[in-house]
Amino acid sequence: MQTISGVLPTVLSPSELRSDDERTFQFDEEAEITTHLTESEDLRRLINETAQLGVRVDHIHDKTDQEIARLEKVIKEVTESDTFFRSCSGWFKTNKNFSDSESSSNTQLKSLSQLHGRYDRDWRQRLNKWFRKNKSKLALPSDNNLEEVNDDKVYGYGEDLMERGKTPYFSDIDDFMNGLNIISPLTPDDFENDDTLVKIDETCQIHSASEPEKTSISPTFGKNIKKELVTDDTESIISGPPLQENKKTLLKYRYVRTSLDMLGSEKSSSKNNSGGMFRIFHKSANFGDKNQENVPRVWDTLRNNLGREIYLLQGRFKKWTTKHQNLKKGQPCKDEDAVTVPLPSSDPGKETQLETKLCFVPEPGDQPLVQA
């Protein structure tokens, strides 16, 4: 009788592979080897389940009982997430009737191999991403206020709720602030934070003060107002409605005023910077090639001036709110209600002051307009 010591992965069951010391098996070469059909069948089933889910497991026969138990837990969680995802997508397919729902659903369901990372949170993010991508096809209410839904029927899937006509955003991931129509109380110090994002959009035409029908009667940025304009002799700020915020603050400004003296360049009076207006993200060969050493100083100047403009607009809004609550229609404001804001000057040792007066000008038959 000849004895051979070795590892037999096709015969041994996972329970027999507990440690390296027990991985040797004595058998008779001439005798028939009895195959454990039940244990081998369980091992093949585990391999098939991982293959169907797209999870590749190397050397599965060498796994210990603890590793195999962990793998089975992953398979169970992914399968439950897959079942919930199919129920959600199936409900939207039957109730919303958009044409290419079948292809988009199948494409997303084929990527199940990526769901075994951070199980619950990772799956929620991917489900959110799918609904956000297809929300234009889900026949949402045309009204800007998503909170008003005609049908209040709620469909519950476990601990998660889904309302008819709404995408299932989760509050711990997508913390949207819908209906925000006023500027957030920012100070110049907020721009030092890397988490704050200031987005400068493309340029647009600033409406002149001679068009009162395009200006709002309040400094709030309403949903039905196309353009809001706040002007005086030294500032010009325009913002597009509705002003919305996410985790990062998004502010839309068309132009940012800068001082020619603070640019520190003799050639800053070129046609691209005429009138003291600096155009954000506008590539200028004359400015970029010959004045590269002034670029950091230029952006510092823009940041400071942008902060002062926000501070000025913030003061105007607070002042207007106070007067609007206390004054009656047609009552003019007094001289002591002026807002004093420091402005940048060419001389660092000197500071100029700007006094802005907010007055109500009564007109017969019309609502009072805010003039700066």
From Swiss-Prot:
It comes from the Eukaryota. Residues 328-353 are annotated as: Disordered. Induces the SOS system when expressed in E.coli, therefore, it may play a role in DNA metabolism and/or in genome stability. This is Uncharacterized protein YPR078C. It comes from Saccharomyces cerevisiae (strain ATCC 204508 / S288c). The lineage of its organism: Eukaryota, Fungi, Dikarya, Ascomycota, Saccharomycotina.
